[in-house]
Amino acid sequence: LCNPSNRRTPRGSWVGWQARYGSLKVGKRRFLQVIEDRGLDVVTQVFFDMQDYTEKGLREKIRALPDGVYYGEEWFEDDGITATPFGVRLSLIVDGDEIIFDFTRSDPQANGPINAPYVVTMSASLNALLYMIGGDLPVNAGLNRTVRIVTKAGTIRCVRLPGSSVGGQTESSPSLMG
């Protein structure tokens, strides 16, 4: 499950893993009980209904925004290896009930660990959108039906292997959320 010997805080890591594992076991047991009580078809339909609800709610909120293209930039002074600044450039396109986060103008990926994989860029973009307009909506796959995230492989917002990406989660991702 977890090898605590290669951690800076082995005891805390091990206790954390045990707690997560225990909560997953409880969640699994309770989820299976809901399926037994209600039936798999009903539970599955509820999942799809919740996604439809989220999509509809987010489309309504996006429609309330003025259509247009909005620009933003965030700069990192360096990547920890070179003294070169790196820019994240966003074109946010609002069109009716859809929204596009376009990061294709961002700088090429860095040698240092400030890059982000696509999934981190997607997650940060969706989180920013939820913070701005959708805080009351359930978080599920319905969000992805109205939002597109566009990046270019090999940039600091879509790192290509063997590029480093730890700072993409801890530094550049929060910068997208303001």
Per-region residue spans from a language model:
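Short beta-strand elements
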Residues: 86-105
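N-terminal leader/propeptide and maturation segments of large enzyme subunits in energy/redox metabolism
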Residues: 1-58
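Short, hydrophobic/amphipathic alpha-helical packing segments
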Residues: 51, 55, 122-130
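Hydrophobic core positions in small helical hairpin nucleic-acid-binding modules
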Residues: 3, 10, 20, 112-113, ...
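Flexible loop/turn segments at secondary-structure boundaries
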Residues: 42, 54, 78-83, 99-100, ...
